[in-house]
Amino acid sequence: MDRRKWVQWLFEAKTRYGLVILNYAVTSNHIHLLVLDEKGRDVIPDSIKLVAGRTAQEYNLRKKRKGAFWEDRYHATAIESERHLLACLVYIDLNMVRTGVVSHPSEWPFGGYNEIQKPRRKCVLIAYQKLAELTGFKTYDAFRKAHKEWVSESLANGDNFRQAQWTQSIAVGSKSFIETIKEKLGILAKGRKIIENEGEFQLREDMRGAYNANFDIEIGDIGGQNAYYWDVYHGNSCT
């Protein structure tokens, strides 16, 4: 029920703020959300506060309880388009397969895979054409077919392990992309390392600090006012 409520409030965030949603997965103990920041710096933090806040409020009312609902911080990563975005997309799709709950992402109802494969006419969450455009495809149908193949190949190859770049990086992409992000962050990026792995580059966060459950900034994080990288970069992001 709480997962379904979270998805409903995600749709409300899209309606209210114009949040551009590329993929998502609501698991048993955490959430992945892949979005595009193209409408201004307040859209993503406002949307997250709405979804998280209302979900927590409704849960507490239903359970007649008080106190924190979200017990852990959320982490945000800026992602370069095309192949890096594709990798993140599939990583999110396979989340519940990684945990052993399902054998295929189509079996999990609280994620974007099924909508990506079977676009809706009503209550649409995923920005279909934008997703195709950002991944380098001319048509959504071409993207959809390729997306299905990527997931199938990952499952067949056993390429379904946890990848630290999505949970411990400020940004993921090409070397030039990462250097641009670091340069724009200026002094805020001091001490953050650029790491290369098989042609993919990451700007790593200092994990001593991050967002807490109430969306405040803890000591050690580079952020401010619920947003760090979208102050300097408007693009794809995964939380």
Could you say what each language-model-derived stretch is?
Residues 32-33:
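N-terminal functional module of multi-domain proteins
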Residues 1-23, 27, 36-239:
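Short Pro-Cys-Gly-centered "Cys-loop" motif that presents a nucleophilic cysteine in a tight turn
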